[in-house]
Amino acid sequence: MATTNTTNTGAILKELYSLPPVRVLRDKSFLHDKLAKEKPTMDFSGRYAYFPVTLQRNLGRGSRGDAGNLPVAGTETIDDAKVYIKRHYYALEWSEAIEVASKNKEGAFENVVTMKMKNVAIDMAKEANRQLYNASQGRLGTITAGAASVTQTLDSVQYIFVGDSVDFITANGQTNTGTRAVTGVDRTASTITVATVTTTTNDFVVLEGNFAVSGTGGESYEVEGLRHIAAEDRTLHTIDSTTYEEWDGNATAMGGNPAGESTFEQLYDDIGSRQRGDMDHYLTTRGIRRRLADEFASQRRYLNEKAVDIKAGYSAIEVNSKPCIIDDDCPKKTVFGLTLDTLKVMEAIKPGFLETEAGDGAVVELKDSSTAGQKVAVWQSWYRYHWTLACLDPGRNGVLTGCADEAN
């Protein structure tokens, strides 16, 4: 006798989708939100903003005897710091058919166009958060063992994901040796998988199109971030700190050693000893902050013999009364000591959609066909954010690099 079951009657059964769609991405953008939303941004127009910086005091000084010759007059050294605007974009594309199919709740969980336009703002903030931590040249990672191979080994793969299209740039910034799609990332081995490309040690990887090679060392279209700001012996905002040491940040290499309380205090003192004010925040990774918490826990003393309600973990970590905060986009093995008032997000235009060529306020347009004069049933749109990061006083910021931490 034939038994009626869910298999042979599947055509009359319904599928119930009662749960909402879920986005399981790493969307938190702490530093960007802190600087752009909690701190005043600075609006400007033009190619760049600049501000005068006094880099050396008047040296026309001296102590003399009775009726001695007075010192020869000196003057302060003042230079213009130039902060160039950076232009950032996200491209969106969807078919006209999917727009119609998802127009109401009967057809889709969510309208596809609404979803894409909502998500792109989150994605742009996340990308901005990554760039706030940039070293020079917008590097995603540096090749540590050059090879002609599908597998490339980097110092870090923290900011690289499957699907990224990346350029391989020679160490001198003069040659792009190939554009490749990333098909695999091994965060333990710190390698990426791409179509075969030939690299040399110290070559570096950037997002496709974000670096323009040239015979003079090339130009990054990304922001000069905290790793560059807190470094020493570098050019920041067109001022060379090898000439003017007061323009240096405060950098200490840890050589793989743990960053303990004493090291945090050293960073605090390095910044404070510049005599321009103390820092106000530590910013680091989960692994480094956890090690710091473990050090504090090992030193804990319970003076109340009746204390029995002991809870694990911690709610806040402070060193020298300054909060130690985690940001998952902070580079691994790194601790920053920051003075947030010295960091300014400079906006030429707020995040928003680029208007179409028609100039009628529209933000979407039909895609051009490969045949001249024809269109295809696909909509296109671009989200833009023209901004950069300015540091008014790099000496009030610092960094510990190469700290003991988790893997990439």
Write out the residue ranges for each language-model feature.
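Core alpha/beta structural scaffold of self-assembling particle/tube/pore-forming proteins
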Residues: 1-62, 74-408
